[in-house]
């Protein structure tokens, strides 16, 4: 009979983070929600596409709301109480993602729009003809 060995596995200790930063990138095609700590280390991320929406339903405000709720609930295990929100992009899921983070139970301290605005830099792409 083979001798069985017992291997002890150390349990990973979750650190306690009281406040963090929620980066919301809202493009016209998708919404990406990333929650980090103050140093910028990513704790959890979720997108509209990863939440089960495909095609044109990814860019709806409801899809952004579901993605933000999913990310917010996943980070509750770290003991996070307050969030600073940084919004990037012109997409339709901007406000609904912030509202859903507030509904999860976070105290939102700041809302900062970090969308890059050109001071007459590169020429924009041509207009769509549908």
Swiss-Prot record:
Keyword line: Ribonucleoprotein, Ribosomal protein, RNA-binding, rRNA-binding
- Which Gene Ontology terms of cellular component type are present? ribonucleoprotein complex; ribosome
Q: Key word rRNA-binding present in the record?
A: yes
Note the SUPFAM superfamilies from the entry.
Answer: Translational machinery components (SSF53137)
List the Gene3D superfamilies hit by this protein, alphabetically.
Answer: Ribosomal protein S11
- Please list the GO biological process terms of this entry: translation
Q: Which InterPro entries match?
A: Ribosomal_uS11, Ribosomal_uS11_bac-type, Ribosomal_uS11_CS, Ribosomal_uS11_sf
**For this protein, what is any one GO molecular function term?**
structural constituent of ribosome
Family, similarity comment: Belongs to the universal ribosomal protein uS11 family.
Which PANTHER family does this chain map to?
Answer: 40S RIBOSOMAL PROTEIN S14/30S RIBOSOMAL PROTEIN S11
Role, per record: Located on the platform of the 30S subunit, it bridges several disparate RNA helices of the 16S rRNA. Forms part of the Shine-Dalgarno cleft in the 70S ribosome.
Q: Name the chain's protein.
A: Small ribosomal subunit protein uS11
Q: Which organism is it from?
A: Xylella fastidiosa (strain 9a5c)
Q: Which lineage is the organism of this entry classified under, starting from the top rank?
A: Bacteria, Pseudomonadati, Pseudomonadota, Gammaproteobacteria, Lysobacterales
